[in-house]
């Protein structure tokens, strides 16, 4: 599929093509950043306006009952649960990924200390050095609180690090920097064989790749909804806990929405049964209502083959992108950080550029290349590396969302990349000024 005409022909035959019409995509834009922020579903603006004007404006406080606000976090969790291998009643949308990770990692550490510390105490939490920073910050904070050691490793070191002194393994199912995807079931089996609990971050996986939490026998999982789920900026995250663990402990943020009888207004805390205990304070109804429109697209996608169809197209999109970049952009210092193995690849492709390849030999030029692409209407993003002081290079990230990305978009994006590199327009000063958000 190396010509524009061939890509267009495949688009005409693509079973998932009707789902693109569910999104309000700007004209002239090739959007390859759904792994950072999903686009606006067409239904969202009107639905949120109705929530604001009718449910809030006219219904006022009655809408907690009449509009079903009170149980919306659980209903949305039930709606999305099958897409991550969860059962009804096991998922709730609430708070942020960072806050939810604090809850479940706290619970996992406590569970490990109380039930898995025999014959010797478990003193370590393991994570990848390239894990998303907020995960590492939360883990660092909790390790300090519990007098544990946070051990950061490279992916290839993982098997040797699963030892009986480890309490919890904290991993992202799909790595944000490379797109590498772990075999969740195998990693979980290996961890459990050593008595280690698993906490999975699904931010770059949920809605993009097959996830089977119960089938993998995972322990805890969190994830955001503003990427592949298209819930909007800052949309509520989700939390899942394996049913065998849910009712064992309070999570540490014991707010009134997690109380067994919140409107009894008792002075002592009694946690709700099940996943509802992982909620904390009053829930953001407008944001949750916007998220519902994003999840409705997934409900519609079930008519077209569900995750099996999405994954098939995702693999094809990323395959074509890699093939075209290597054919059409050779000789410009780009490397591939993302696995070629489709069973180890998420729904993104990450390209590297060597330190010293930038203007006047400073930096990699990757940031400026991405800015030049964005100026042309090809939107991806940039993630900074170690600046030559470590193993991680600067990254140009491109996300491929089967709900709306076309093969024609892939071809055109690579052609723009080729032109940016060949013309060296990325060297212009305006593309080398660093913005607050990269």
Per-region residue spans from a language model:
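Pyridoxal 5′-phosphate
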Residues: 1-438
